[in-house]
Amino acid sequence: MSAPLASLSHYKRIVIKIGSALLVDRGAGLKHAWLDAVCDDIAALRAKGVEVLVVSSGAIALGRTVLNLPGGALKLEESQAAAAVGQIALARHWSESLSRSSIVAGQILLTLGDTEERRRYLNARATISQLLKLGAVPIINENDTVATTEIRYGDNDRLAARVATMTGADLLILLSDIDGLYTAPPHLDPEAKLLPVIAEITPEIEAMAGGAASELSRGGMRTKIDAGKIATSAGCAMIITSGKLLNPLRGIDEGAAHSWFAPSAMPVTARKTWIAGQLQPAGILSVDAGAETALRAGKSLLPAGVREVSGHFHRGDTISVVGLEGREIARGLAGYDADEARRIAGHKSAEIEALLGYAGRSAMIHRDDLVMTEQTGRKAGKSTKKKDEAHA
């Protein structure tokens, strides 16, 4: 396992995710002093040669304040209207605050398809790369004016992880309302301990993550752990820390409490990073023990090892592979449509032509199109006792 670097200035490219509750106060609106302090931190990092990208929540929260919408859950059309108003205000505030340090901000609004569809993914990556090359700071958010319940990231933690892997960042920082991952909710358990270093996201670590989220923010510790799995598998370290300090990034360097998640020692290729990071696999293949062993040995997934096929997918779609314990172990690109996959599941590759009427591929998922998503072989450290949840 690699160790945390001594200073943020030792990283080359950092993605910073900022939640709505940190940026927006329900009664007073945008927290100007806090935003200015964060922008000062960003300017200090850039002065040391660090490239910085920001994934900023807050459009809906800011828009509902401007529009004086009532508290509680919003209808979809209300959220979209709030986002339309809030996005303009949010971008303006970021631009004005960064301009104090002569830094140009560039707004990018993404939808789920921009990271899930390969061509759009590459185009979005090229745009962000060009902004960085020109010296601008990309301010990224989900395009909530067009996103629907069915086609959305659902939270900016996972969006930030996708941006980090897309852009080849070596550190993702999630600013939260808590200073890291605890073994239990610290407000409920006086014995709860902060985990300063997480070597690997194991089932025990996942069990510590809760799903609580505030009214202003859709995310919780559960989504932060999901983000960590996406980022670390691509070789990107992750930090969860409190954003309540006026200068939270400077605070990390000055010793503020945080949890550091180690990047994988064997990050997957850029193409496999995209496959592994897909947020909505189109289907599921349940496999037997023999197939699971073969996949861990780097082999392709053959039809004989598939016990069950779920979902509706087409050849080339990303699908999830689930082992006997019901946990996802891999993801890959389907070699067959779902209906064909069901017909050949459990059969030998030599029988495919007789079953389908044509000689198709021998593998359900070829090893070149498959990436393991369940890490094995490393310990998570001493403080990995299973708890019900962690305060988010």
Curated annotation (Swiss-Prot):
Record-listed E.C. numbers: 2.7.2.11
Family: Belongs to the glutamate 5-kinase family.
Pathway: Amino-acid biosynthesis; L-proline biosynthesis; L-glutamate 5-semialdehyde from L-glutamate: step 1/2
Protein name (Swiss-Prot/TrEMBL): Glutamate 5-kinase
Keywords, alphabetical: Amino-acid biosynthesis, ATP-binding, Cytoplasm, Kinase, Nucleotide-binding, Proline biosynthesis, Transferase
GO molecular-function term, one example from the UniProt record: RNA binding
Annotated GO CC locations: cytosol
CDD domains noted in UniProt: AAK_G5K_ProB (cd04242), PUA_G5K (cd21157)
GO biological process: L-proline biosynthetic process
Enzyme type, top EC level: transferase
Gene responsible for this protein: proB
Top-rank lineage group of the source organism: Bacteria
Keyword Repeat: no
Primary residence: cytoplasm
Species this protein is from: Allorhizobium ampelinum (strain ATCC BAA-846 / DSM 112012 / S4)
InterPro entries on file: AceGlu_kinase-like_sf (IPR036393), Asp/Glu/Uridylate_kinase (IPR001048), G5K_ProB (IPR041739), Glu/AcGlu_kinase (IPR001057), Glu_5kinase (IPR011529), Glu_5kinase/COase_Synthase (IPR005715), Glutamate_5-kinase_CS (IPR019797), PUA (IPR002478)
NCBIfam families xref list: proB
Location of this chain's protein in the cell: Cytoplasm
